[in-house]
Regions:
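Catalytic machinery of carbohydrate-active enzymes
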Residues: 1-346
């Protein structure tokens, strides 16, 4: 049994949601071993207060200064085990500020950005090769001899978080949360079109009398989506875009009957609170990054996008291969999504 465990997973929201049940599993297996988690400041805002976990935040925007702060916080301390569950050069640098006897990283094939050079032990190679990100993270627990998974998240929410959610979901009809946009990165085309969202909203309202809530961050693209959708639906939709904290958003998702979103954090937040989620996937493989417990609800046009982009089948390309085409998400039809809606609300 390790005397102490440090988990290093800085980001992003979805991946930290994947990491949490692994940490819960380690807590169950090693109840006397304190667990520290080095996490990004944004992600900490969602997971803050999770029982039995000491969080140490790292501000990615503050770079070297944050690294020095970590060094100071860990001065005189040594962990039995460091689980570096974040294969990136930034995480590699952060790991050098964490004193640990055993420094466990990914196997060579998954140890991106030379992570293998910052580890002295590695988890087993992935077999079968095509596994969900969450399954890959559970290999860290398995490496420590723990195979009994605890698929629980138990993210702490306040009474105020719950009350806000109750206030915005108490209208007639089922509450459907639409988080229309993913985080914006270069050549990362994951967003469905506004026109298709409008058709979907019309179906939700007319077929099920649904109360539709838009959620998201206050980015320019998300605010644009909200403005267009509100204007073209006659304000029959409520926009919470840029108006909630992450914990408030989780409470809203928990209170909703359904979440619809592209490959993004809210898909995995919904998984954490067992709210059905329809994932919109064409540019990334849902077998790897889809909502873990709702694969059957994914509107999946990834195979068609791969064929269109590479002239190959999914099995012929690298697992996790991205499609960098701005047209790929248009392969998902409104009918693809309404069929999944009917499976949940019908």
């Amino acid at each position: 049994m390790p005397e102490s465990i440090c988990v290093l997973r800085l980001s992003a929201i979805g991946d930290c949601c994947h990491t949490l049940p692994v940490v819960r599993t380690l807590q169950s297996a090693f109840p006397k071993s304190p667990i520290t988690w080095v996490i990004g400041t944004t992600e900490h805002k969602l997971l803050e207060g999770s029982d039995g976990i000491e969080f140490i935040t790292f501000d990615k925007s503050d770079g070297f200064s944050s690294w020095k702060n970590l060094r100071r916080q860990f001065a005189g301390k040594q962990f039995s085990v460091l689980l570096n569950m974040n294969a990136s050069m930034r995480a590699n640098m952060v790991s050098t500020a964490i004193p640990a006897l055993r420094r466990i990283g990914f196997d060579r094939a998954r140890a991106r950005d030379f992570q293998w050079a910052f580890s002295n032990e590695r988890i087993a190679e992935r077999h079968p090769d095509r596994r969900h990100v969450l399954d890959g993270l559970f290999q860290f627990a398995e490496y420590l001899g723990v195979t009994d998974r605890q698929m629980r998240w138990d993210i702490t929410l306040s009474d105020a978080d719950r009350q806000l959610a109750l206030d915005v979901t108490s209208g007639p009809g089922p509450t459907c949360v639409i988080s229309p946009c993913s985080s914006q990165r270069a050549r990362n085309f994951r967003n469905w079109s506004i026109d298709k969202y409008l058709e979907l909203i019309d179906y939700l309202q007319n077929q099920y009398g649904a109360q539709v809530l838009l959620t998201g961050a206050p980015t320019d693209i998300e605010k644009h989506y909200a403005q267009e959708i509100l204007a073209r639906t006659g304000n029959t939709v409520t926009s919470l875009i840029g108006k909630t904290t992450l914990k408030e958003l989780l409470a809203v998702i928990d209170a909703a009957k359904l979440v619809i979103c592209p490959d993004s954090g809210p898909a995995h937040m919904a998984t954490a609170v067992a709210t059905p989620v329809i994932g919109l996937y064409a540019t990334s493989n849902p077998e790897r990054t889809g909502p873990y417990n709702d694969q059957q609800l994914v509107a999946n046009r990834y195979p068609e996008a791969i064929e269109q982009e590479f002239g190959k089948s999914v099995s012929e390309v690298r697992f996790g291969q991205r499609v960098r085409s701005p047209e790929a998400m248009d392969l998902i039809s409104v009918a693809d999504v309404t069929a999944k809606v009917d499976a949940v609300l019908g």
